Amino acid sequence: MTGSHDKTARVWSTDHIQPLRILAGHLSDVDCCKFHPNGNYVATGSCDRSVRLWDILNGQCVRILTGHKGAIYVLAFSPDGKHLASAGADQRILIWDIGSAAQVCELKGHSDSVYQLVFSRDGSILASGGLDNCVKLWDTGGFDGDGKIAEPQKCLLCSFPTKSTPVHCLHFTRKNLLLGAGPFNA
């Protein structure tokens, strides 16, 4: 899966030179792509400030999610596939219900662009990081009956500042240990 400056995302196979699908519809660069856990869908984020959910089998856009005020740099699906988190230049994390296409939560706390999002294995924690040199952990296990997080302002569990290092990669291990990486300039 690749995103491109030509406003498309492309689905590739390792045994073909040509793309299997070209997903066109964004109005600007496609900066991030993420497969849904079931493998039948892919989400794309763009400088046009929208997230699109695509059906891989037929190449059709099935959802358009709008609400960001800047480019979208990162996407993360919850392990159960019911929610999608998106973030980017507007320093906010938006969480979406995939079934209804509704925004269920807005998480604020970063002071610069967010470049990394990852859910814990059980989906109860979302880790975020970016250019503000900080890793933040958010409680995402509190969805109410309407599928929304009751009190998003109380979701921030903790912040871990780095030593002047932007966070470019986060990963939860199988034992729920969080690994982070970024460039360090001494």
Kindly label every feature range from the protein language model.
Residues 9-12, 33, 51-54, 75, ...:
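WD40-repeat beta-propellers
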Residues 2-6, 44-48, 79, 86-90, ...:
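Conserved strand-to-loop turn within each blade of WD40 beta-propeller repeats
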Residues 7-10, 19, 27, 41, ...:
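A conserved positional marker within WD40/Gbeta-like beta-propeller blades
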